[in-house]
C-alpha cells in the first residue's frame, strides 16, 4: 500500500461518539478543554452533540449532562481554526434543531440514516445545503448492504444536496476488503466533486487498517476519536492513526505530539472505564451489532442475569439496527425467561 502524497481531512468524534462511552455525561469544562486541545493540535473538524445527535436527549437514548445548545455555545466561540460539526438523525433531530445549530455557528451537518433508509434524509439535507452548510450524508451500518445497495442510497443523498457521503461501519464489523469494495464503488459512481468519508469502530481491532483501505480506495475524510473514546471498543484512535499517517507520508495537518497529549492528559482521565476490546465489545464486531448497544446490553446483564455477549449475539441474529435500543431490554428479558 502506497499512500504517499495523499491528503486526508481528519474528523474527531470524541465529543459525540464518546458521549456513548460516558453515558452522555461529559461536562462543559471537559467538552471545552478537549475541543480547544484538538483545535490547538490542528484537527480541522470536531463533532459536538449528544451521542445520538441533535435532539438525542430522551428516555430511549439517555439524558445528557447539558443540552446540545449549551455544548455548542460553549465550544464554538473557543475555536481558532477548527470547525464544529453536528450529527442529526431524522426522526430524532428536527429541522428546528438544524436551524439552531446553524445559528450557533456549526459548519458541518451530518445527516445520518440506516444504510437502507436514505429516503428519510431529503428534508434535512436540503435545508442544510440551503443554509450554506457543509452537508454530509452518513450511511450507518454499511456492512449490512452490498456496495451496489450502498451506492443506490448514496446517490439519493447526493441528489438531495449532500456534498460528502460516508460509508459508516457502525458495528466495527467490516474488514479491509469490505471497505475497499464499498468505497471504490462510491468513488467510481458518485460525482467527482462529492467527497467520500469513512467512519470506523475498533471492535474487531480493524479501524486503522480499514481507514487506510478507505484512503487507498478514494476516501478523503476519515473519522477518528482521540484516545479512541467512543461506543463499543471506540472509534479509530486518532493519535495512533496520525502516527501511522506520518509514517506513510499522508498529509493530514495535525501535530502528532499535541494530539498525543490531548489523548493522554485530557481524554484518558475522563473515561468511566478503559476503552478496549473486551469480550462484549468484540462480540459487537463479530455479530455486527450497533456499537452504542454495548452499555445497554451490560446493564441488561445486571438486570436479568443473561451474559451481555449472549444478548448481543441474539441482537445480531435478529438484525437489529440503531434506534432499536428498546429491543435490548425486551430481548434480555425473554432470554432470561427461556433460561428459567
Curated annotation (Swiss-Prot):
Keywords assigned: Aromatic hydrocarbons catabolism, Lyase, Manganese, Metal-binding
BP term (GO), one: L-leucine biosynthetic process
Pfam entry (one): HMGL-like
EC class name: lyase
Site positions (Transition state stabilizer): 16
Record-listed Mn(2+) binding positions: 17, 199, 201
Amino-acid positions noted as binding substrate in the UniProt annotation, renumbered to this chain: 16-17, 170, 199, 290
Catalytic activity field: (S)-4-hydroxy-2-oxopentanoate = acetaldehyde + pyruvate
EC number: 4.1.3.39
Keyword 4Fe-4S belongs to the record: no
Gene Ontology molecular-function annotations: 2-isopropylmalate synthase activity; 4-hydroxy-2-oxovalerate aldolase activity; manganese ion binding
Domain Pyruvate carboxyltransferase: 8-260
Protein name as annotated: 4-hydroxy-2-oxovalerate aldolase
Organism of origin: Shewanella halifaxensis (strain HAW-EB4)
Origin organism lineage: Bacteria, Pseudomonadati, Pseudomonadota, Gammaproteobacteria, Alteromonadales
